[in-house]
Structures are given as C-alpha cells and as structure tokens.
Amino acid sequence: MANFLISVDKTLRHEGGFVHVKATGEVAKFGITVWFLREIGELPPAPRTDPARPTEISFVRRLTRDQAVEIYRRHFWERYRIGEIRDQDLADKVFDLVVNTGPGGWASIKGRRVFKRGALVLLQEAVNELRGKPLLDCDGILGPISLARVNSTEAGALLDVLRAKAADRYRSIAAANPPLAPNLHGWLERLAA
C-alpha cells in the first residue's frame, strides 16, 4: 500500500497558494477550485459557468493546508483507490495526475455524455500497452481487476509508459485549446518530477 502523505506532499509542491484569475473566473488554493468545492458540497451548488461569489472567494482564501490534505485524501486518494497501488512512485504519479487531469471515463458536460482520457484511463491504457493486449477496460475505474493488473505489472516500465501517455495527452490539450498552450511546459515539467 502506498503512503498518502508522501504522495500529497509531492503534489502540493506543484499546487500553489491562493489564485484568482479574474479573466477566467478561476479561484483556487492548493489546487482546489471553487468549482470542485461546489461539486463536493463544501460550497452551495451552482452552475460551473457561474463566477465565484465573494463569499466563495473568501472561503477558498481561508482554506488551510490541513483542510486541503483532507479533501485530497477523501475525494481523490480514497475515492479512486490510489492507496491500493503497491509501488509508491507509481502511486505518487497517478495521484498527481488525477489531481491535475481528473480520473477520466464518462462524464456529463452540458447535458452530453463525453469520454475523458484522464489519469486512470491513461493508467489502464499503459497496462494494456505493456501487456501487449487489452486486458483492461479503459473506463477510468480503478477496481479490483485493474488494481491486480497494475500491481502485477513492472512498476518502473508502467510509470514510463504512463508518463509518455500523459505527455501526449497534455500536448493534444494544448493543441486543441490555444489559450492553454502556455501551460504545456509547466505540465510537462510536473509530469517529469
């Protein structure tokens, strides 16, 4: 079992303090956004298109590191079963990618079902690639079958393939969304860390 405190410490080195980008409406601290806090019930629900309210901005500004760690534990580490990955380095990277890209799988966006290639989908794809056949459904769910395959695959090789797949994903995001292209260098540096 991987150690959550090691993983979250590494991720928090990349996630900065309080951020309020007025042009986009993004408000976050320790990488935790107003929109995510709404989704998990820490703030009243509102459409994602609604800008952050002054009370929400104050709430995020007051968020402590300990509170952020607990949110990451419950809503990322435990929810997606990352702690059941045996190799610490692999668990660290999977956790950081889930925080940065989401888990992946089917999502509802503006009333449409959309498949997203997030961290857990990329991990499942990496296992299949290394095994040379589609052993896993790439659905973004880290269930018992996926965990068994992840834990029985050589961790160093799996980490290398996962990083390559994530780098390709970041490049495709930047190419499809020119306003995000300036973030590509930072995403790739974080991925290599």
What is each residue range found by the language model?
Residues 1-193:
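Cell-wall polysaccharide-cleaving catalytic domain and substrate-binding groove, primarily
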